[in-house]
Amino acid sequence: METKNAKAIARKVSIAPRKARLVVDLIRGKNIAQAQAILTFTPKVAAPVILKLLNSAVSNAVNNLKLNREQLYVKEVFVNEGFRLKRMFPRAKGSGDMIKKRTSHITLVITSSTNLQTSKEEEQSGSKN
């Protein structure tokens, strides 16, 4: 049986990937209720963006794939580096330093815990043969 995964991607988010990864690491592997509670009370700039992305992925799972909301958990979540905006910061004697304003691409995949159980059962039955 093929597992059903719901996916949501936020591209060109104006948060540095290093800062976004701190928040993303908190919710990896958690169920949806725990992840939403963690993101609600995390005092980081990336937390509201990732919470919005999580809610979008949950909506995709419930509406498009007809999965049960209570059985969903975060299967994988990762942050890739987006493009960099290069800006000049004026320095002495007419020179300037480069400022790199970094952006992120955040990908979140959720699945149902029943999918996990069935895939484990298939692996066990396949290994016996």
Swiss-Prot record:
One of its GO terms (cellular component) is cytosolic large ribosomal subunit. InterPro entries: Ribosomal_uL22 (IPR001063), Ribosomal_uL22_bac/chlpt-type (IPR005727), Ribosomal_uL22_bac/org-type (IPR047867), Ribosomal_uL22_CS (IPR018260), Ribosomal_uL22_sf (IPR036394). GO terms for biological process: translation. GO terms for molecular function: rRNA binding; structural constituent of ribosome. This protein binds specifically to 23S rRNA; its binding is stimulated by other ribosomal proteins, e.g. L4, L17, and L20. It is important during the early stages of 50S assembly. It makes multiple contacts with different domains of the 23S rRNA in the assembled 50S subunit and ribosome. The globular domain of the protein is located near the polypeptide exit tunnel on the outside of the subunit, while an extended beta-hairpin is found that lines the wall of the exit tunnel in the center of the 70S ribosome. PANTHER family: CHLOROPLAST 50S RIBOSOMAL PROTEIN L22-RELATED (PTHR13501), LARGE RIBOSOMAL SUBUNIT PROTEIN UL22M (PTHR13501:SF8). This is Large ribosomal subunit protein uL22. It comes from Aster yellows witches'-broom phytoplasma (strain AYWB).
